[in-house]
């Protein structure tokens, strides 16, 4: 039965395991005099696509909108039922890449390093939304095709947090932190996590699939977020 599961289904299961395991993990932060303790979650962000409203209609038909399949950890964000095929310059493709909502002003594709090798795309490491001078690709949907002139990136590892989390860790928006993952006697350290602070945001680290697999995140016994 396990052999019939596709990669995205497996990654979804892994993310759920990670949520449950690290929901009460030691955050590694300094004690807070107000009694607030950050609730650290570390997530594997699988390959995905963000679309503009116009590109949704091109790919799925006039008047089409994204259909929510599952809420993501951050409030207001969701995995859509819709998927697209991503085609690279070598005519190699990644079928059924999940779309995340809501829509954005500009479409972008976030892939792991190994995905880029497979497609023949030399992707820069960028913060989400920083798309200037990035490579493009072709997106294929059931009703049409979109040729992106830019927008394919390897998302920079980062940590989302709210104002109370930032105060507890002693960091500010756009600063850098370190994540330490303890798994099976092998500790992996990820440096230069970009801090992204916003109101109403839950504390969550995003790693891509290559990074999560390298650290054996699924079997981690402890994670620490360090200033």
Where are these regions (language model features)?
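Short coil-to-beta-strand transition motifs
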Residues: 187-189
């Amino acid at each position: 039965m396990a052999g019939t599961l596709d990669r995205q289904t497996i990654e979804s299961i892994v993310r759920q395991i990670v949520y449950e395991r690290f929901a009460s993990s030691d955050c590694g932060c300094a004690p807070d005099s107000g009694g607030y303790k950050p609730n650290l979650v570390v997530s594997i962000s699988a390959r995905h696509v963000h679309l503009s409203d116009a590109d949704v209609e091109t790919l799925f038909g006039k008047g089409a909108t994204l259909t929510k399949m599952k809420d993501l950890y951050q409030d207001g964000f969701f995995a859509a039922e819709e998927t697209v095929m991503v085609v690279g310059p070598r005519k190699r493709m990644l079928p059924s890449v999940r779309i995340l909502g809501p829509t954005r002003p500009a479409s972008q594709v976030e892939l792991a390093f190994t995905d880029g090798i497979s497609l023949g795309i030399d992707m820069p490491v960028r913060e989400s939304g920083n798309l200037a001078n990035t490579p493009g690709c072709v997106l294929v949907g059931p009703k049409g095709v979109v040729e992106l002139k830019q927008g394919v990136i390897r998302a920079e590892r980062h940590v989302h947090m709210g104002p109370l989390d930032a105060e507890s860790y002693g960091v500010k928006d756009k600063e850098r932190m370190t994540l330490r993952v303890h798994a099976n006697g092998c500790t992996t350290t990820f440096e230069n996590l970009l801090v992204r602070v916003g109101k109403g945001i839950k504390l969550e680290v995003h790693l891509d699939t290559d990074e999560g697999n390298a650290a054996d995140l699924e079997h981690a016994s402890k994670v620490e977020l360090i200033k």
